């Protein structure tokens, strides 16, 4: 069956050419809708691709990691494990803290996940320890997601406990209410409390125990219902002085009588106003501070959330005393806005470059204005559809629009060039517009739908990568569709009204020079093409070699996942020996902070020491380093990290791990480095056997750097081995022993002070200043059956052992996470393969499993689907072209151009030192759509010449190549210049945009040269093949 062109009647463009007012108003409506839509589009760094994630934190001061695991974490995990839609569950149990992170499937709404988590916590309540100070608290937040904003609250006139109290009640609560905020944490929070430090010798001399004191305090401070009196005429509410509010009141509390004389709490203890947890501390630029970290909910718009916080900050700070200073240390939206601004500038630059190349070729202002109108109209009209689809203005959608500048102008160029050709031959503009638009209409439709077909596989990519690029693909597809509509409606109408034979022939010296140059180039191309057609097998050999080279380059090119961005914020972990105390860690962080703040690129620094939901152990500290803006420093973030690590390396007893924050966060736990690999077993003993072996093996690999693990099993522990028979004979139970130890060393929260604004705790502990270390255990006394006191040493033997500092689970089983970076000269693909090879070499047993986590796991998934993604794009394009041409052969001819694009893109990436990451892969997929345009324009005209003019296939393709050479060159250069600003970008977020530009520019340069010669040769080869098939199988002879 023969494909007939629309003819000279104008085809689908006829109505719009003949009704210019209606066409103008229709385009004005598209423009207006786009302008209005733009005003409603939110701004973000990337599309919303967050997994629904919820963190559950349970604090149990004084509990060991083993107790936290068995008594708190395990019961919660059993209930959470029954929830539907749960993708992954990880937990970390350390001294006094249990953190369970729940990651759900992408398709599950966060609110539904929240309901399931709340129900699971309720079901586990009866299984948890009865003396938990607070029930488990959940937050709709991913702990690995860096804070969107960090504020430091300092004062040179008030104690930190008072500052913390004001910040918690007046500032943090209000910020928590902002839409999009998932969690506000107060790092180093010195919450006010009454601290009771018992003098062990004093209570022993009086025959008392710490349990006697605890019972007296809890009985003296209550706040419960008392009822009311309801008389015949009046009702009276009952109240009492059952609450004690200050340290002075507790100091005067009578806890016992000795020989008729009262023993007050102040006689046997130091009672003072202090902090609830004395092992927490935070610093901002080395000054003690309350550091407020604001994290967003998964899926919340970071810009809108930060703007809302900024708007309320002045009002919140006014409620604080003048001596309290609130400083915004970091705001991730600053870099996001700068990145978006840079991308917007590159978009405008791309438009300007495209219009410039149009003028260079057409050398006519009216002819330049026409596609110059089509470009912004197509891009602006896209905004209206983006609003409807709940998209945002982000780096990826702006990159799509930047690339689209080269795409959307193609259709207009093809139409203008064809109409101009008829006007130059002497036809009237209206007739030329009708004839030229009708002739080219099928080509426009072919170009449009075949290009959109390339994007279809992107829409069906699964998991987070598919969600990430859905907005990119749809935005680009919408721009291309609008461009096709504009090119078939507005462009021919404007050509009929604005172009004339006189205007096209009007030339100045520059125009004549350009014309002579183009004539010489076309003539040279014609001579070269004639030689190529005379030596087809040599050309086919080049095409085949190109295919082989593409495969070879694909194999050898370094592969990565997502470009490492320079967002101006570095997250760090400071690691010390496992037996380090809070005091020693505080000293170490001061030394490290001093070195870091000396770096010229560093603007501010916050550090935190202590155990809470973010920091698992006392021997580690968290750091956040805020760099100066990119234009105010000389080095990129990786260079700064290297310099800082070198500066800190000379400090004994510490290891500093640093990594830049990223806009794309896939992990569910804060890691020391960028990539993670887990080793999981059914028991801790199995882990303890294999972790050192695997860690040593990984540390020896050149493809990995800064290898570390969270396995810490050498923490000092005092094992109290109770002689149960002796204890039973004295009437002492194990509960008595645990209570005595907890009272002395657990910073036990024994009572609550209620106020109108907040609640504060009474903390009980032994004053160990005079008896540090294990000697403090000798001061513990217990009450025996006869009422006397017995030293702990009488019934127990104290042993010093090693114990884990934290116990980690993944889906309820023990796990260790190895963290690593990739050194310069290697790629993530190299590192992954090296780890897999090492795993095979070690021959791990069946009950030991390994798995990559976070971005490394996503890299594996993306790498595995990349080849199929490209194959799917090619198949989709073949189907679309086959349907349009009603031919099995012609689509193959068109698709034969694709290897040239791959060679150019891969070579350009290798030369530029870039990895083949998912951004570059998107560029290659787009190249598939661009490069085949050349072949479509050639083949369309060759088929028309054969059909309408009776030309031979050789003459037809030769003429088509010469006639379409100029529009092919124009459209290719337009696409190249559209991608050029991305390739040359140097501003904020350039790391994200550059791979796309490099791949496209390299692919276009190589393919432009090769396809102009290989396509006509392959066209003739398949024509002869078609004739051969028809002669051998006449029953199946095609009509096309």
Curated annotation (Swiss-Prot):
For this UniProt entry, the molecular function terms from Gene Ontology, in alphabetical order, are: xenobiotic transmembrane transporter activity
What are the UniProt keywords, alphabetically? Cell inner membrane, Cell membrane, Membrane, Transmembrane, Transmembrane helix, Transport
Family statement drawn from the similarity comment of this UniProt entry: Belongs to the resistance-nodulation-cell division (RND) (TC 2.A.6) family. MdtB subfamily.
Q: Where in the cell is it found?
A: Cell inner membrane
> Membrane-spanning regions, if any?
25-45, 347-367, 369-389, 396-416, 440-460, 472-492, 537-557, 863-883, 888-908, 910-930, 968-988, 998-1018
- The UniProt gene name for this protein comes to mdtB
NCBIfam families given for it?
PRK10503.1, RND_permease_2
**What is its membrane topology?**
Multi-pass membrane protein
Q: Kindly list the GO CC terms recorded for this protein.
A: plasma membrane
Oligomeric state and interaction partners are given as: Part of a tripartite efflux system composed of MdtA, MdtB and MdtC. MdtB forms a heteromultimer with MdtC.
Name the source organism.
Answer: Salmonella paratyphi B (strain ATCC BAA-1250 / SPB7)
Q: What is this protein called?
A: Multidrug resistance protein MdtB
Name the PANTHER family for this protein: MULTIDRUG RESISTANCE PROTEIN MDTB, PTHR32063
From the UniProt annotation, give the residues forming the signal peptide: none
Question: Please, which domain of life does this record's source organism belong to?
Answer: Bacteria
Primary location class: membrane
């Amino acid at each position: 069956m023969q494909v007939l062109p629309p003819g000279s009647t104008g085809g689908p463009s006829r109505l719009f050419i003949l009704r210019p007012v209606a066409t103008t108003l229709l385009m004005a409506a598209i423009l207006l809708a786009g302008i209005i839509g733009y005003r409603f589009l939110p701004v973000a760094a990337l599309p919303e691709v967050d997994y629904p994630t919820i963190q559950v934190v349970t604090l149990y001061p004084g509990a060991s990691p083993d107790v936290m695991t068995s008594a708190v974490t395990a019961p919660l995990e059993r209930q959470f494990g029954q929830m539907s839609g749960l993708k992954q569950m990880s937990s970390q149990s350390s001294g006094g803290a249990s953190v369970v992170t729940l990651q759900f499937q992408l398709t599950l709404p966060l609110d539904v996940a929240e309901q399931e988590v709340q129900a699971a916590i309720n079901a586990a309540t009866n299984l948890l320890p009865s003396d938990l100070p607070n029930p488990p608290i959940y937050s709709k937040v991913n702990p690995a997601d860096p804070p969107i904003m960090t504020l430091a609250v300092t004062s040179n006139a008030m104690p930190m406990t008072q500052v913390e109290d004001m910040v918690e009640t007046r500032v943090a609560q209000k910020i928590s209410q902002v839409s999009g905020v998932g969690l506000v944490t107060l790092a180093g929070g010195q919450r006010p409390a009454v601290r009771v430090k018992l003098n062990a010798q004093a209570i022993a001399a009086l025959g008392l125990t710490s349990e006697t004191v605890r019972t007296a305090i809890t009985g003296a401070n209550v706040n419960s219902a008392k009822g009311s009196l309801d008389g015949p005429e009046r009702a009276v509410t009952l109240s009492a002085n059952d609450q004690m509010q200050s340290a002075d009141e507790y100091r005067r509390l009578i806890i016992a009588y000795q020989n008729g004389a009262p023993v007050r709490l102040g006689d046997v203890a130091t009672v003072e106003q202090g902090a609830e947890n004395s092992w927490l501390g935070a610093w901002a630029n080395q000054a003690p501070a309350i550091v407020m970290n604001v994290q967003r909910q998964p899926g919340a718009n970071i810009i809108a959330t930060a703007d809302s916080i900024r708007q309320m900050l002045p009002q919140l700070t006014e409620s604080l005393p003048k001596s309290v200073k609130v400083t915004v240390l970091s705001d991730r939206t600053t870099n996001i806005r700068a990145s978006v601004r840079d991308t917007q500038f590159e978009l405008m630059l791309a438009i300007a470059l495209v219009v410039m190349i149009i003028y260079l070729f057409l050398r006519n202002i009216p002819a330049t204005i026409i596609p110059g109108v089509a470009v912004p109209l197509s891009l602006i009209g896209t905004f209206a559809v983006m609003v409807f689809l709940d998209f945002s203005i982000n780096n990826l959608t702006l990159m799509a629009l930047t690339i689209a500048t080269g795409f959307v102008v193609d259709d207009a160029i093809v139409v203008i060039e064809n109409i101009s050709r008829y006007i130059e031959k002497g036809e009237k503009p209206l007739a030329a517009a009708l004839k030229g638009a009708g002739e080219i209409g099928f080509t426009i439709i072919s170009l449009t739908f075949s290009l959109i077909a390339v994007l279809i596989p992107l829409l069906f990519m699964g998991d987070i990568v598919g969600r990430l690029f859905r907005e990119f693909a749809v935005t680009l597809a919408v721009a291309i569709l609008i461009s096709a509509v504009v090119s078939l409606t507005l462009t021919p109408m404007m050509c009929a009204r604005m172009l004339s034979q006189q205007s096209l022939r009007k030339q100045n010296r520059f125009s004549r020079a350009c014309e002579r140059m183009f004539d010489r180039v076309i003539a040279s191309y014609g001579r070269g093409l004639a030689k190529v057609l005379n030596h087809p097998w040599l050309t086919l050999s080049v095409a085949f070699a190109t295919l082989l080279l593409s495969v070879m380059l694909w194999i050898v090119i370094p592969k990565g996942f997502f470009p490492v961005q320079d967002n101006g914020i570095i997250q760090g972990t400071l690691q010390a020996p496992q037996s380090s105390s809070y005091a020693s860690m505080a000293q170490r962080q001061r030394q490290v902070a001093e070195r870091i703040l000396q770096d010229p690129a560093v603007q501010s620094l916050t550090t935190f020491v202590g155990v809470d939901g973010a920091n698992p152990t006392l021997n580690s500290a968290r750091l956040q380093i805020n760099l100066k803006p990119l234009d105010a420093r000389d080095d990129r973030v990786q260079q700064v990290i290297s310099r800082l690590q070198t500066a800190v390396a000379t400090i004994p007893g510490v290891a500093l791990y640093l990594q830049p924050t990223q806009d794309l966060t896939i992990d569910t736990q804060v890691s020391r480095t960028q990539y993670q690999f887990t080793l999981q077993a059914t028991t801790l003993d199995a882990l303890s056997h294999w972790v050192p072996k695997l860690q040593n093996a990984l540390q020896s690999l050149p493809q990995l750097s800064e290898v570390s693990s969270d396995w810490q099993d050498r923490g000092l522990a005092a094992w109290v081995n109770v002689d149960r028979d002796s204890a039973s004979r004295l009437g002492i139970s194990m509960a008595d022993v645990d209570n005595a130890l907890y009272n002395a060393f657990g910073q036990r929260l024994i009572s609550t002070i209620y106020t109108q604004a907040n609640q504060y705790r009474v903390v009980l502990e032994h004053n160990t200043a005079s008896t540090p270390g294990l000697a403090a255990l000798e001061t513990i006394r217990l009450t025996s059956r006869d009422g006397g006191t017995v030293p702990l040493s009488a019934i127990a033997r104290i042993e010093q052992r090693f114990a884990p500092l934290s116990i980690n689970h993944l889906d309820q089983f023990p796990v260790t996470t190895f963290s690593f970076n990739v050194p310069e000269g290697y790629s993530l693909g190299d590192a992954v393969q090296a780890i897999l090879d090492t795993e095979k070499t070690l021959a791990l047993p069946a009950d030991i499993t390994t798995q990559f986590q976070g971005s490394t796991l996503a890299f594996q998934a993306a790498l595995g689907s990349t080849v199929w993604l490209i194959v799917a794009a090619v198949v989709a394009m073949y189907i679309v072209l086959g349907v349009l041409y009603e031919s099995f052969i012609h689509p193959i001819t068109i698709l034969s151009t694709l290897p040239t694009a791959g060679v150019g893109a891969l070579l350009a990436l290798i030369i530029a030192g870039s990895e083949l990451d998912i951004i570059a892969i998107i560029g290659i997929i787009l190249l598939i759509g661009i490069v085949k345009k050349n072949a479509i324009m050639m083949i369309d005209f060759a088929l028309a010449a054969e059909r309408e003019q009776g030309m031979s296939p050789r003459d037809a393709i030769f003429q088509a190549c010469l006639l379409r050479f100029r529009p092919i060159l124009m459209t290719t250069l337009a696409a190249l210049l559209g991608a050029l600003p991305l390739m040359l970008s140097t501003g904020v977020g350039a790391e994200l945009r550059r791979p796309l530009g490099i791949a496209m520019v390299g692919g276009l340069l190589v393919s432009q040269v090769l396809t102009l010669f290989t396509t006509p040769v392959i066209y003739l080869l398949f024509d002869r093949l078609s004739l051969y098939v028809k002669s051998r199988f006449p029953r199946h002879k095609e009509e096309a």
